[in-house]
């Protein structure tokens, strides 16, 4: 019957989801516990550049907060 395809469909769905989830965890691990940010728009790029300058270590994913602002 039609429901015999469900196990194969479930396996295929899991195989398609694993790379996306694994990529998110790898980015989170390599970027100091934060997810990877992408500056596709000019505004996002400016925010990343601002965070890079404010961090004090030239990395956008290291946040130091307000104590670094002069």
From Swiss-Prot:
Keywords: Electron transport, Membrane, Mitochondrion, Mitochondrion inner membrane, Respiratory chain, Transmembrane, Transmembrane helix, Transport. Its main location: mitochondrion. The chain crosses the membrane at residues 1-21. InterPro entries: NADH_Ub_cplx-1_asu_su-1. It is a single-pass membrane protein. GO terms for cellular component: mitochondrial inner membrane; respiratory chain complex I. It comes from the Eukaryota. It is found in: Mitochondrion inner membrane. Complex I is composed of 45 different subunits. Accessory subunit of the mitochondrial membrane respiratory chain NADH dehydrogenase (Complex I), that is believed not to be involved in catalysis. Complex I functions in the transfer of electrons from NADH to the respiratory chain. The immediate electron acceptor for the enzyme is believed to be ubiquinone. Belongs to the complex I NDUFA1 subunit family. This is NADH dehydrogenase [ubiquinone] 1 alpha subcomplex subunit 1. The gene is NDUFA1.
């Amino acid at each position: 019957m039609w429901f015999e395809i469900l196990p194969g469909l479930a396996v295929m769905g899991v195989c398609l989801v694993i790379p996306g989830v694994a990529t998110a965890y790898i980015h989170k691990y390599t970027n100091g516990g934060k997810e990877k940010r992408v500056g596709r728009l000019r505004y996002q790029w400016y925010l990343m550049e601002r965070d890079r300058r404010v961090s004090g270590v030239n990395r956008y994913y290291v946040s130091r907060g307000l104590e670094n602002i002069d």
